[in-house]
Swiss-Prot record:
Residues 115-300 form the Rab-GAP TBC domain. This is EVI5-like protein. The arginine and glutamine fingers are critical for the GTPase-activating mechanism, they pull out Rab's 'switch 2' glutamine and insert in Rab's active site. May interact with RAB10.
Length: 794
């Protein structure tokens, strides 16, 4: 459904048809070649007036754009000759657009700055952004049939978009319906951006000039090619960049006003966010905002920076006298209506502002580097927080496991004590075995001696009984050790499977093997002793018959020799078993010592790594502490310097204000003298001349009175200078997220939509006490500003 082409309102028609406020001719700013081209165009345009097609195009409803290239004072019909020339010229531009863009770009730029005629805006805007033939136009009808997740938000804000305009007034009106269609279609085309507050005002202005399909194509091109898409993204990173660049320009060109804003905590985003998001459509009336939008379509966001800084330059003196609340009201009530009668003056002021594209590119790179650095710092902080959380969890785990470790250490200590007792018993058994072997050797030596006494035999019997007793005790001790080993195995099975416990179990197993070998050796020794005892008993039985026949003596000697051989064999076997057991013990001890050394080495390496980590962490913390101290000292010095600079600049500004007021008074007097002199030159009445001479004398007397007082009699004296709020680091935003978080949402809401009834009653109550003072200050400001503005015109 296409929307008809509508004019903004009646006031816009009057403003667009008004002549240029500046009395100087624009032809003075053109080169000779361009002037010659204009003369030729005038000749061709006059010839084209005779053509019927040109006449039909001229006889329609027309509106003047408020600017022309060649001024003319003659009027022959309803449309002046100036309007006819402008219409014919813009018709030629629309028909020969490509040639004008290639060869006459400078002249085209001047024409656009003077203003595009209302009925040409639709086609010229489409040509400027190359939106005449876009593939997305064919998809528009299909997009309207789809559903968008942003429909509720769009419906909510449509009623607050141009609520006073006839085209959008009334619920479910034609204007609101086509506005909803365009916003819904774009939210489906660009799902990343979707819908953002402020974009509806731009679409609404487009719908006032062209049908909805063409408005949709132009809006898509604006979002893609004019940086608006980056402005309306959820992160609003481009808006932060624009605020950063505008703050730099404000600080460079208006340092006193910038200092005043900071001292009052009046952030740039509180008043400039809506300028960039709505392109002044919510700030100025539609005639003035449309002029700014014409230039934006050709030059981009540069005009927003220029117009914004021009507004601050014009109102610097008034803003310097206001606090934060007063400045907010001044931006909402006074600034929007300063250029209603003459938009050309605003454009002239805007192009007097210094704008350096290279410097803006450099600021963009600095902002990107700053944002990347902030992102890296946030990532590093997040990593440190994660690491800190993991360390805390590890400490809690270690504290919980500390009790278990203590219990394990106590149980290991008990096992080691029992193992020491078992080793001591094993060593005593080995000593008993050595004693038994020495006894066997003594018996063998005595066996070699044929003469044995009864005392020696009784001694051997006593030793045999003692050895049997010791053997019985050894067997009892072995049984006790076996019981203890079984008990320790049961206790070890209930303990956690740690490295030290496993090693102790291996040692216990090796000890059990050695104990088994010792038991086997003891049994074999017992058998050998039994055999030796039997042999000895037999020998004793034969000892009483040694006086028998020689044959028996020979048999006895052979038996003795056999017994000695067996004793030597038993001794050799015992020595072999002893050596094998010793080898096993040495291997076990070597294995235990190696395991112990490995554990000690692992613990030493772990402690060394922990020591290095703690040393590195301590070094980093010391570096951060020194850096923080250095930054704090620099910040304190910088704050003191800025305070002194603010005081000096404020004193200079007060002196400049006083000088400017005196200069304004002098200019007013000169203007009155010139006016009276002109009247004198054209008058023939002598009586009138005498009256004028009297008036001149009175004016001269007033001049002497005005020149008499000193320039600092007003209340703005240096004695009243005070700096209650100094700049410090706390008053400045730490990042763009905080800057946007403080001011963007509130400033955008206040700029886009009117105040609620409750807020309006609050501001009316605030205005009642200061009504008289405001009236007097406004009248004084108007009296001082009127001659100054007329002097600029002259």
């Amino acid at each position: 459904m296409a929307s008809p082409t509508l004019s903004p309102d009646s006031s816009s028609q009057e403003a667009l048809s008004a002549p240029t406020c500046s009395p100087t001719s624009d032809s003075e700013n053109l080169s000779p070649d361009e002037l010659e081209l204009l003369a030729k165009l005038e000749e061709q345009n006059r010839l084209l007036e005779a053509d019927s097609k040109s006449m039909r195009s001229m006889n329609g409803s027309r509106r003047n754009s408020g600017s022309s290239l060649v001024s003319s004072s003659s009027a022959s019909s309803n449309l002046s000759h100036l309007e006819e020339d402008t219409w014919i010229l813009w018709g030629r531009i629309a028909n020969e657009w490509e040639e004008w863009r290639r060869r006459k770009e400078k002249l085209l730029k001047e024409l656009i700055r003077k203003g595009i005629p209302h009925h040409f805006r639709a086609i010229v805007w489409q040509l400027l952004c190359s939106a005449t033939d876009m593939p997305v136009k064919n998809q528009y009808s299909e997009l309207l049939k789809m559903s968008s997740p942003c429909e509720k938000l769009i419906r909510r804000d449509i009623a607050r978009t141009y609520p006073e305009h006839e085209f959008f007034k009334g619920q479910d009106s034609l204007g609101q319906e086509v506005l909803f269609n365009v916003m819904k279609a774009y939210s489906l085309v660009d799902r990343e951006v979707g819908y953002c507050q402020g974009s509806a005002f731009i679409v609404g202005l487009l719908l006032m000039q062209m049908p909805e399909e063409e408005a949709f194509c132009v809006f898509v091109r604006l979002m893609q090619e004019y940086r608006l898409r980056e402005l309306f993204k959820p992160s609003m990173a481009e808006l932060g960049l624009c605020i950063y660049q505008f703050e730099y320009m404000l600080q460079e060109q208006l340092p006193d006003l910038n200092t005043h804003f900071r001292s009052q905590s009046f952030h740039t985003s509180m008043y400039a966010s809506s300028w960039f998001l709505t392109l002044f459509l919510t700030t100025f009336p539609l005639p003035v905002a449309t002029r700014v939008f014409d230039i934006f379509m050709y030059e981009g966001l540069e005009i927003v920076f220029r117009v914004g800084l021009a507004l601050l330059q014009v109102n610097q003196a008034e803003l310097m006298q206001l606090d934060m609340e007063g400045m907010s009201q001044y931006f909402q009530r006074v600034i929007p209506h300063q250029f209603d009668s003459c938009p050309d003056k605003l454009v002239l002021k805007a192009y007097q502002v210094k704008y350096n594209p290279k410097k803006m590119k450099r600021l963009e790179k600095e902002y990107a580097a700053m944002k990347s650095k902030e992102m890296e710092e946030q990532i590093e902080i997040k990593r440190l927080r994660t690491e800190n959380r993991l360390l805390k969890q590890r400490i809690e785990t270690l504290e919980k496991g500390q009790v278990t470790r203590a219990q394990e250490a106590e149980e290991n200590y008990v096992i080691k004590r029992e193992l020491a007792v078992v080793r001591q018993q094993c060593s005593s058994a080995a000593e008993d075995l050595q004693k038994a072997q020495s006894t066997i050797r003594q018996l063998q030596e005595q066996q070699e001696n044929p003469r044995l006494t009864e005392d020696f035999v009784s001694h051997l019997e006593t030793e045999l009984e003692q050895s049997r007793l010791r053997e019985t005790e050894t067997l009892g001790a072995l049984r006790e050790m076996q019981d203890k080993v079984l008990d320790m195995e049961k206790r070890n099975s209930s303990l956690p499977d740690e490295n030290n416990v496993a090693q102790l179990q291996e040692e216990l197993k090796a000890l059990k093997v050695r104990e088994g070998q010792a038991v086997a050796s003891t049994r074999e020794l017992k058998l050998q002793l039994q055999e030796l005892s039997d042999t000895w008993q037999a020998h004793l039985a034969r000892g009483g018959r040694w006086k028998e026949s020689p044959r028996k003596l020979v048999v006895g000697e052979l038996q003795d020799e056999l017994m000695s051989v067996r004793l030597r064999e038993a001794q050799a076997l015992a020595e072999g078993r002893e050596l094998r057991q010793r080898v096993v013990e040495l291997e076990t001890q070597d294995h235990i010592h190696r395991n112990l050394l490995n554990r000690v080495e692992a613990e030493r390496a772990a402690l060394q790594e922990k020591l290095q980590y703690l040393a590195a962490q301590n070094k980093g913390l010391q570096t951060q502490l020194s850096e923080s101290r250095r930054k704090q000292a620099e910040a304190e010095c910088k704050s003191k310097e800025e305070v002194m600079a603010v005081r000096l600049r404020e004193a200079d500004s007060m002196a400049a204000v006083a000088e400017m007021r005196q200069r304004i008074a002098e200019l007013e007097i000169q203007r009155e003298e010139g006016r009276i002199q002109g009247q004198l030159n054209h008058s023939d009445s002598s009586q009138y001349i005498r009256e004028l001479k009297d008036q001149i004398e009175e004016l001269k007397a007033e001049v002497r009175l005005l020149k008499g007082p000193p320039p600092f009699e007003d209340p703005l004296a240096f004695d009243g200078l005070s700096l209650a709020r100094h700049l410090d680091e706390d008053s400045l935003p730490s990042s763009d997220e905080e800057l946007l978080g403080v001011g963007v949402g509130a400033a955008l809401q206040d700029a886009l939509y009117p105040l609620s009834p409750r807020d309006a009653r609050f501001f009316r109550r605030l205005e009642r006490p200061a009504k008289d003072s405001e009236g007097s200050s406004d009248s004084d400001a108007d009296e001082l500003a009127a001659p100054y503005s007329q002097g600029l015109d002259n």
